[in-house]
Amino acid sequence: MKMLSTKATCNSHGQDSSYFLGWEAYENNPFHHTSNPNGIIQMGLAENQLSFDLLESWLSKNPDAASFKRDGKSIFRELALFQDYHGLPAFKKALVEFMAEIRGNKVSFEANNIVLTAGATSANETLMFCLAEAGDAFLLPTPYYPGFDRDLKWRTGVEIVPIHCTSSNGFQITQSALEQAYKDAQTRNLRVKGVLVTNPSNPLGTTMNRDELNLVFDFITSKGIHLISDEIYSGTVFGSPGFVSAMEVLKERSSEDEEVWKRVHIVYSLSKDLGLPGFRVGAIYSNDDMVVAAATKMSSFGLVSSQTQYLLSAMLSDKKFTISYISENQKRLKQRQKMLVSGLQKAGINCLDSNAGLFCWVDMRHLLESDKFESELELWKKIVYEVGLNISPGSSCHCTEPGWFRVCFANMSESTLKLAVRRLKSFVTELRSTTTSNHRNHDNKICKNIKKNIFTKWVFRQSAQEANRKMQAER
């Protein structure tokens, strides 16, 4: 008799992806600067650890928030009791104002339109449950975050159809790519319910420009489908062009089609911008009352604790702090990104130009033995197990071109990043030396064969000439 459910035993979780296998390798041999200096450095984790000191400084100056007090009096019992899963009004108000602040206050958000979830993972899955049936499809531009194979598909039964983007235009979405993805879904007899984009992009570290967003809006309008804009990296934009939210474009186009207004949904989180993934704070923002109502009911399976909401409502309500934090955090991200990019360039490795995120999209196509994904995985294994760096291969992100890798830079100390770059540079130098040596040996072998063939032919000619002379002498 079958003891477990089909859901428990299905293979759609994506656990066998090289993205997760790299994590396993790291967990079995984690780098530590003193206890395990030769261990694997984790560069596959998109965490922002660069500004903890700013958060800790605020906490030290605001002890009531951290100790669950209001005006010096304990509110522990109030927070410890069951809370309505709609969320604390003070926190929802502070959160939507913070979201607007990150977007330069070009758009505003209504607290009643937001649904709190236990992180962006929960938010994206909840939207799948709200907008699609099992067997329906969402279109996602490649490369995309490897975790989406788990977050969007595993429990919902929703299918992902890739919108294939290429390096020829910096992996931007094109009209032809959108239409081809839609046709691919139809060929598979899948009903397309929407498009999901990450902006800024994970893994590219780039922002979508207004033209690209309008292209997507034109597409979803013509097809009558939804748009989910995952904007969890919106506060990490450290360079130009700046960040343009889907809500900003929607506001500009709202007079064209009222129905589209209800079919655009934003996913947000404090995991990346504030560096608080352990707090599990995510959100869905939608202009559709039915989506908000349904998502709110579903959020009871993944609530944000009252203690977390209370602490963060105080922090995000401190406008002087949030403005200063956003600016300083972006400066630190820019500095760290430059450190990685310049270090890789010295090793002969280039990156896609980026202006956001906690990672770079690194081009190692020239290090592959062939232009096949098998060659990419072989290179990845060497980098993980021989070099000791866990990075994410492009194939795990469904990239169409072998040889691209996502490399994170904000989840480690500066000294650890420098060590990682030195390791990679040494590996590339050795790889090139080996390749050059192999080519030289190959060339020498060819030369020897050529000389041998020439000598053999000369011997045959000499023998033939000698034989002719003997024949003539005999005559």
From Swiss-Prot:
Q: What class does this enzyme belong to in the EC scheme?
A: lyase
**What reaction(s) does this enzyme catalyze?**
S-adenosyl-L-methionine = 1-aminocyclopropane-1-carboxylate + S-methyl-5'-thioadenosine + H(+)
* Record's keyword terms, sorted: Ethylene biosynthesis, Fruit ripening, Lyase, Pyridoxal phosphate, S-adenosyl-L-methionine
Annotated CDD domains: AAT_like
What up-regulates or down-regulates this gene?
By tissue wounding and auxin.
Q: Which residues carry this modification: N6-(pyridoxal phosphate)lysine?
A: 272
Cofactors required: pyridoxal 5'-phosphate
* GO biological process entries: ethylene biosynthetic process; fruit ripening
Instruction: Give its E.C. classification number.
Output: 4.4.1.14
This protein's record includes keyword ATP-binding:
no
UniProt cross-references to InterPro entries, sorted A to Z: Aminotransferase_I/II_large (IPR004839), Ethylene_sulfur-biosynth (IPR050478), NHTrfase_class1_PyrdxlP-BS (IPR004838), PyrdxlP-dep_Trfase (IPR015424), PyrdxlP-dep_Trfase_major (IPR015421), PyrdxlP-dep_Trfase_small (IPR015422)
Which pathway, per its entry?
Alkene biosynthesis; ethylene biosynthesis via S-adenosyl-L-methionine; ethylene from S-adenosyl-L-methionine: step 1/2
Keyword S-adenosyl-L-methionine set for record: yes
Q: Which GO terms describe its molecular function?
A: 1-aminocyclopropane-1-carboxylate synthase activity; pyridoxal phosphate binding; transaminase activity
Q: What does this protein do?
A: Catalyzes the formation of 1-aminocyclopropane-1-carboxylate, a direct precursor of ethylene in higher plants.
The Swiss-Prot or TrEMBL record describes its family as follows: Belongs to the class-I pyridoxal-phosphate-dependent aminotransferase family.
Complex and partners: Homodimer.
Protein name per its UniProtKB record? 1-aminocyclopropane-1-carboxylate synthase CMA101
- Can you name the source organism? Cucurbita maxima (Pumpkin)
